[in-house]
A protein has these predicted regions:
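N-terminal maturation segment of proteins
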Residues: 1-287
């Protein structure tokens, strides 16, 4: 029936999104096989320059599928899910959804700051988890290369971040690389060693081999990736948005923030409407 067809579609969407990166998959499902997800080569996923034309084609395909479901034939729970998916679709149709203003890097919560934490806290439940973790370290140079290409394009388009933000990211990269000359004492290696010692998944010989592999990957992949990112950002320094008002003064700045308000906060009001509301106590309560 309609509920079964809709549930199959939702499960397919879930599979697609949760397998977009090994980090997402690992932190979402403890046992991917229980949801029919087979092991694959672990990667951080892709970072690409936004392409509105191809994205619109994808959204059209999604809309065709979603509107094919008869809402009144769905269960109450599935009706709510359909409404949420349609709301998300409307958000993604907004011009700001593919804006180059979206910034994966940042001085406080950027990818370069989150990755060491995500990798250090990566749970080792099975031998496959450890193999995936090591594959992720190997994939980091490719992933950071994609990030660098995106930042270079942002610079060419005049929407690269300002020097204050860049300096903060570079400082974080430098702090991460502080122990690069002694990888055996780096935080990631120390944490990895402690987790292996607490695990019963490997023999002593296998643990030692994992530690050797981990140390080599830090030296050959992880540290060079962070150096490359730092060097690339240094070369782009001074080419970012320096004007007062920041990104909101860019050509599509307001449309981007309107998209963020609707997609991340669930607020349908425009930035201008919110500004007016915030100027009055009653307006603030109305939110």
């Amino acid at each position: 029936g309609e509920n079964r067809r809709f549930s199959a579609y939702v499960e397919e969407r879930f599979h697609s999104e949760v397998t977009s990166s090994a980090i997402t998959l690992h932190y979402t499902l403890a046992d991917p096989a229980s949801r029919g997800i087979a092991p694959g080569t672990a990667s951080f996923g892709t970072v690409s320059i936004p392409d509105r034309t191809s994205y619109d084609a994808l959204l059209q395909s999604v809309e065709t599928t979603l509107t094919s479901f008869h809402r009144n034939r769905l269960s109450a729970e599935n009706q709510i899910t359909l409404d949420l998916l349609l709301y998300e679709l409307d958000c993604e149709k907004m011009p700001g959804s593919t804006s180059l203003l979206a910034e994966p890097l940042g001085p406080s919560l950027g990818i370069q700051a989150q990755l060491p934490i995500l990798l250090a806290e990566y749970p080792f439940r099975t031998q496959q988890d450890i193999a995936d973790y090591l594959h992720l370290l190997q994939d980091l140079p490719r992933y950071f290369s994609d990030l660098i290409a995106l930042e270079q394009e942002k610079s060419r388009q005049g929407v690269f971040q300002n020097d204050l933000a860049v300096d903060g990211i570079i400082r974080q990269c430098s702090a991460f690389l502080a122990d690069a000359d002694t990888p055996e004492s780096h935080l990631l290696h120390t944490v990895f060693q402690n987790k292996l010692q607490a695990s019963s998944l490997f023999s002593e010989a296998e643990r030692n081999l994992c530690l050797q592999t981990h140390e080599k990957l830090l030296t050959s992949c992880v540290f060079p990736a962070y150096r490359s990112l730092s060097d690339a950002l240094s070369s782009l320094r001074g080419k970012g948005t320096q004007n007062a008002g920041g990104l909101s003064r860019q050509e599509d700045g307001l449309s981007y923030y309107a998209y963020l308000l609707r997609s991340r906060v669930g607020v349908d009001a425009s930035p201008e409407e919110l500004t007016r509301l915030f100027k009055t106590p009653l307006g603030v309560y109305a939110l």
